[in-house]
């Protein structure tokens, strides 16, 4: 880590993740190694019992052997835009925890804040929802407000699964730890093609979930393409530095008919997600 940050192993998590990724790319390896053997068996077993037992199930004794390490998706810092009570702009819909964009995170997640965020906003959302049940009113949900099951030939479920698996690989390779304008544009173009194909997806759980995954992937890729700078976990290899006050804003993705992406914050709109 001395080649990547002056704090070495104590560097911010996004820098550590990119450092691991770059070493894996340089060496063509599937992982790097973490050596904690110097801490001693007693300390490791008492301080990290879950890690110790998990690695032991894979025949890795962390008191004597190095731990293979690879980056992965850990936390989503965007989400459904809510107020401080977990309320979204859809009456009666509340969100709390990692699914929500409540404003407590910036371009990086605050360390050890996940459980506290769920606890605080889960409690506030429950209070607000309870109050709404007794004092609020809900819109009349007419049948025409819901998507109708389209006619015609449906896409086979196995084709939906292929798109889902391909989307996962695309998001990791093109919209992952290190991004470029070229990789992001390719991702946006491919996701748009999948989005069109999925209009014929079956109205079952795999079909609906894959549609949602493609939609979220499109928002992430488009927001990352628009944000031509690097900040926190969003790292553009072609724009490695954070420059300009114009980037000190959130970006939102709002579904309309048809769905479209709005880069940045425009007049008379609400912020609904973070890039």
Regions found by a protein language model. Give the residues of each.
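An anion/pyrophosphate-binding glycine-rich loop and adjacent beta-alpha core
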Residues: 1-67, 119, 128-134
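Short beta-alpha connecting loops at secondary-structure transitions
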Residues: 5-6, 104-115, 146-153, 172-176
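A conserved FAD-binding loop/helix module that cradles the flavin
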Residues: 90, 102-129
